[in-house]
Amino acid sequence: MSAQLKILAINGSERDGNTADVLRHAARVAENRGVDFEAVDLRSIRMERCGPCGDCNDRPVACTLADGVPEVVAKMVAADGIIFAAPVHGFGTASLMQTFIERAGVGYLRFDRPLSNKVAGIISVARRYSAGEVWAQLTVNALLNRMILVGSGFPATVHALHRGDALKDEEGLTNVSRLVERMTDMIELLDEHRRLTGRSDVLASNEVNERVGLALNELQAQP
């Protein structure tokens, strides 16, 4: 019997508010399908901003800043699916999530793309404006990491202002439920493929990452 499948949610909100409520809703949907669901609240993680070293495009190894980001990255690598959830602040992605995708992406994930072929889901929470823009940014980040995005109909954008408003957005929560259901379907399909074929290299690539071969790149292939 295979191990229990897991979805990890990254909560990019600075407070225990509407985004957290939406993820609790998502957790119930996943758990009803027998999937383990864990939410990581970035507000509880010690996370430094990028430092002044400026060597991100030259270093061939992981970032040396000592904080909680590597632990979260390890959880992501161990999960079968990952949900990126963030509220809209100032017409853009909340600063905690923005800092995390910069630190995790440039500092750890770009070297060998360890999130390749994991199933991704995107949720944005907004009063009214820029929900689509934040959803799109997080979607591009998932695609950059070679993750699998499963279409779920309307994007999982939830509208809310005051605490508790997210749970009143019936259409938004329906879209979140559909997202989690479809993610679970794909995770189960990939798990079945691995068990039946004995292969773990679903959608294998012969590139370490897309940076190889670029001019002025620290990972440029040697002749």
From Swiss-Prot:
Binds 1 [4Fe-4S] cluster. Keywords: 4Fe-4S, Antibiotic biosynthesis, Flavoprotein, FMN, Iron, Iron-sulfur, Metal-binding, Oxidoreductase. This is 2-amino-4-deoxychorismate dehydrogenase. It catalyses: (2S)-2-amino-4-deoxychorismate + FMN = 3-(1-carboxyvinyloxy)anthranilate + FMNH2. Its cofactor is [4Fe-4S] cluster. Belongs to the SsuE family. One of its GO terms (molecular function) is metal ion binding. The gene is sgcG. Converts 2-amino-4-deoxychorismate (ADIC) to 3-O-enolpyruvoylanthranilic acid (OPA). Pfam families: FMN_red. One of its GO terms (biological process) is antibiotic biosynthetic process.
